[in-house]
Regions:
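Surface-exposed extracellular loop regions of Gram-negative outer-membrane beta-barrel proteins
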Residues: 59, 106, 164-168, 213, ...
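C-terminal beta-signal and adjacent terminal beta-strands/loops
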Residues: 403-425, 439-445, 450-504
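Face-selective signature of the C-terminal outer-membrane beta-barrel domain
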Residues: 33-51, 72-215, 229, 284, ...
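Outer membrane beta-barrel strand-and-loop segments of large Gram-negative receptors
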Residues: 132-136, 177-190, 265, 269, ...
């Protein structure tokens, strides 16, 4: 029997006037299933979103304290993905799943500065488009209760077009930072097996390989894991794996003033990592689980800037404007602990904590904290459901999530360099990269929903509150033109989203 799911969402933030700008978000998701008697099951799926944000400049020049007060910006993001999948089950405990898909993303952004005469000059302009055509297939075969093998292949053809220009200083012409147009391919394949050595020991082993045709860089990555069922309630596991990744497409096409039209990063290799992880799981009861997972990760061949603390491991901006080399390293050490109680009598809860240390070595050979080295993240989640209605068919649900995490990392301010900058743009002492840290953050979210389960058309009302604790996000620092001081740039965004959903 064929089935389908269709979901459209429009965020109520589009109806709000946020301070200094507007935000608009909407998305669409669908999936159609068509089972057949002899030819397997066909599925058609799709997802898309539109995300827009505009920031207005302050019209009253007497209120211009910071550079951002006289800046007007736009940020429009469009994304879509869709495909057709086919799954076929053979008579010998084997299955084949094949998918043909396409993805598309576009980012249109820009910033304009105004002077006291209300004359505007462009400061940044960005237009990037990415399209991926994907073919992937996976063959799974269960040879016995103790031996299963999976083989997969993926071919991704990536089309790209990007144009990014930035003015080096205010009122100067825009200069090309990153530009490229063309296509390349990423080819990957893997084979993995799960072998039950005994009733208590299970071995998982496999190998993964990939090739980037842009520069013919390739990698072969072994992965292995061993699991021991020590008792009916306790399990231990040890796993090792090698992983690699390509960079975002814009990195490969950076152009600098010294190289002219030549893209300086086209020959970058994959960033590679070695993972080692232990795992202990304990089933306290049918409804309660405890899991403890210490791990260590070593990264190498990380793209960095020569003789600098810069590394792509800290990248948060949407562009890179420098020549890079694969000489960086990284190291992550930590432990994850999770305790969860599954839903019973309408109640569930989970407590998890992560303690970690994340460091990297830049192109100058010095080890630093990574930008994301918060050191700890603690999550608490609790929810309660009540069955209501004449036949107890409706559900009132209340959920609460609290997150306590270490503050963002940042580099010390280089006051002299900042004051000497023509635009007083804040400069940082990169020889002490990310050595400072903001205060811890407490983030709270909640959801209250009421689901009415009608026979033909179930529907649901929901109210979601994001960051009701008022935690502040930090965006760096800004020079105050009135006081002559450098202030922290932060913002606390508290959102309440009301939604209504129909299922048919």
């Amino acid at each position: 029997k064929a089935s389908y799911i269709f979901n459209y969402r429009y965020s109520t933030t589009g109806l709000l006037n946020l301070e200094g700008g507007t935000m608009d978000y909407q998305d669409l998701n669908l999936k159609l299933n068509f089972p057949t008697r002899k030819a397997g099951t066909f599925s058609v799926w799709g997802t898309s979103l539109i995300d827009k944000f505009t920031s207005d400049f302050e019209k009253n020049t007497e209120k211009w304290d910071y550079w951002g007060d006289r800046s007007e910006s736009r940020d429009k993001q469009y994304m879509a993905a869709g495909g057709v999948s086919h799954r076929y089950f053979f008579n010998n405990d084997a299955s084949l799943k094949t998918t043909i898909a396409a993805t598309y993303s576009q980012l249109d952004g820009g910033a304009t500065l105004f002077n006291h005469s209300m004359e505007s000059t462009p400061y940044m302009d960005l237009d990037s488009k990415y399209t991926n055509l994907i073919f992937t297939t996976t063959f799974n075969r269960k040879f016995s209760n103790r031996f299963t093998n999976k083989t997969g292949f993926t071919y991704t053809n990536m089309f790209y077009k990007m144009d990014l220009s930035i003015a080096p200083y205010e009122a100067e012409p825009l200069e090309i930072v990153s530009q490229g147009k063309g296509n390349t391919s990423l080819i990957s394949a893997y084979n993995s097996s799960s072998v039950g050595l005994t009733e208590r020991w299970t071995l998982n082993a496999g190998i993964y390989g990939q090739l980037l045709t842009l520069n013919n860089k390739w990698s072969v990555e072994p992965r292995v894991g061993l699991k021991w069922q020590a008792t009916p309630k306790a399990t231990f596991a040890l796993a090792y794996g090698m992983y690699s990744r390509m960079e975002k497409m814009d990195v490969y096409f950076v152009k600098t003033k010294s190289t002219g039209n030549q893209s300086v990063n086209k020959d970058l290799d994959f960033t590679k990592a070695q993972h080692i992880m232990l795992s202990f799981g304990y089933k306290i009861s049918d409804r309660m689980n405890l899991k403890i997972e210490p791990y260590i990760q070593f990264l190498h061949d990380v793209p960095v800037m020569a003789d600098s603390s810069y590394s792509v491991l800290n990248r948060s901006d949407f562009y890179v404007e420098d020549a890079l080399v694969n000489k960086g390293r990284g190291r992550n050490v930590g432990i994850d602990i999770t305790f969860e109680r599954f839903l019973e009598k309408g109640l569930y809860y989970m407590i998890s904590g992560s303690w970690f240390d994340s460091r990297y070595r830049g192109g100058d050979g010095v080890w630093y904290n990574t930008k994301f080295n918060r050191n700890y993240v603690i999550n608490g989640l609790i929810g309660k459901e009540w069955m209501l209605g004449r036949n107890k068919q409706n559900i009132l649900s209340v959920n609460l999530k609290l997150t306590l995490q270490g503050g963002d990392r940042y580099s010390p301010i280089d006051l002299e360099a900042t004051m000497n900058h023509p635009d007083k743009e804040v400069q940082y002492d990169e020889t002490k990269a990310f050595s400072k840290q903001y205060s811890p953050m407490l983030i709270g979210n909640y959801t209250v929903s009421y689901r009415i389960n009608k026979r033909k058309v179930p529907h649901e009302f929901a109210v979601k509150g994001l960051n009701f604790t008022g935690a502040k996000e930090h965006y760096g620092h800004e020079y105050n033109v009135k006081t002559g001081r450098i202030d922290v740039s932060d913002n606390s965004t508290i959102l309440t989203n009301v939604s209504y959903k129909l299922e048919f």
